[in-house]
Amino acid sequence: VTAAAVWAVPAAAAASVQGISSTSCIADNANILSRDTETYITNISVALQENCSGAQIGVYTTDYVGNNTMEGYAYEVFQAWGLGSADQDNGMVLLMATGDDNYWATPGEGLESAFSGNVLSDLLYDNLEASWTKQDYDTGARKTVLAMAERICDVYGVSLDMDAIGSGLADSSGRIVENTQSRSNGGAVLTLILLTIIIAVIVIAILKTPRG
């Protein structure tokens, strides 16, 4: 499978765009992405939107694209979804069609220079192809979206640890998220140790006190 491949199903009707929402960057119609992966992608897309002039990445999955080409269907999804800033047209759609055993990505005009045909084909091959052949769609989607996001950050001169943001280890501005539960548990352990030491000191003092 390559990003530039064009598949068609002549006997099938044109597939309609389904499941998209202006409040979500995930449309998992094929039900192939885990909740953790959806959260990972959403976190990255939100960070892009906040730090890269409204840029967004959307992941759209389906079984088949009907008698559309992959390129044509991805463009329809892109137009219907309206990802990215309207004035900069800096959205990106990753289309994954499992029944057709193919994938495609379409950038908005504002990102076309950064994602030329060869660049985008190489990016998809390097980050999605190996996982795709194993039907490990979660890993493929994560790696591909991360690679896209890092390139978009380069376009806007933004330095963010997108993997940490996607994983929830950093917020959308890149600040490390403290694990309050671990801090709470650590404080409780420290308190217990101090109490144990104090009690031990008191017991030793009592034992050393001369009998009257």
Feature annotation, model-predicted:
Residues 13-188:
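Folded, non-transmembrane soluble domains that reside on the lumenal/extracytoplasmic side of membranes
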